[in-house]
């Protein structure tokens, strides 16, 4: 038996994040809450979300179950709701029923065995910066019409994001005093595909800050919390493979 009640805003943000890399996802529901891990078909980006039961206004799960869903179908349900509403979710055999005020809609579940849950790689780095989401977004937006990649540089002095083409270039500089925290004793550099980052930053609009971690030509790790619910937060992890440059 699964019965949940969650704000439409939280559900939309979860769905928007997943839709940046996958069209189908498998959720694990147990006594602690709900979690999902997904990787895009090209194995370039991965997302991990942990939704503690405290995020839900109602939460009941008898044991551990897996729920596999088409993300577009989930988004079609969310479009029926007002952003200030809550949505009730109940598993009924092979369907998931959504109650939104005086509207109810059932969506067929997918076979969970057809969706592989990826293993999260151990790519921890001791180098990181905690950056305001709004500052990070400005750096990405400055680069989006210049190149399809962006280069990050982290040092003891701060964080830089640069992009260039034959005719244009952009640079965002965040000195140490503009960062919430910084841990870096060296100068490290790595480039990443901009398309994935632009989709990601748009989907995490409620996050206040991002913990960005990487090494030279190494996968990028971004840890964040979604802040729609002041009493409990959704914990997220975004991983992105580097773009190797000549």
Swiss-Prot record:
One of its GO terms (molecular function) is DNA polymerase processivity factor activity. SUPFAM superfamilies: DNA clamp. Keywords: DNA replication, DNA-binding. GO terms for biological process: leading strand elongation; regulation of DNA replication. Homotrimer. The subunits circularize to form a toroid; DNA passes through its center. Replication factor C (RFC) is required to load the toroid on the DNA. Coiled coil: none annotated. HAMAP family: DNApol_clamp_arch (MF_00317). The keyword DNA-binding applies. PROSITE patterns: PCNA_1 (PS01251). The lineage of its organism: Archaea, Methanobacteriati, Thermoplasmatota, Thermoplasmata, Thermoplasmatales. This is DNA polymerase sliding clamp. CDD domains: PCNA. The gene is pcn. The keyword Disulfide bond does not apply. Sliding clamp subunit that acts as a moving platform for DNA processing. Responsible for tethering the catalytic subunit of DNA polymerase and other proteins to DNA during high-speed replication. Disulfide bonds: none annotated. It comes from Thermoplasma volcanium (strain ATCC 51530 / DSM 4299 / JCM 9571 / NBRC 15438 / GSS1). It comes from the Archaea. Belongs to the PCNA family.
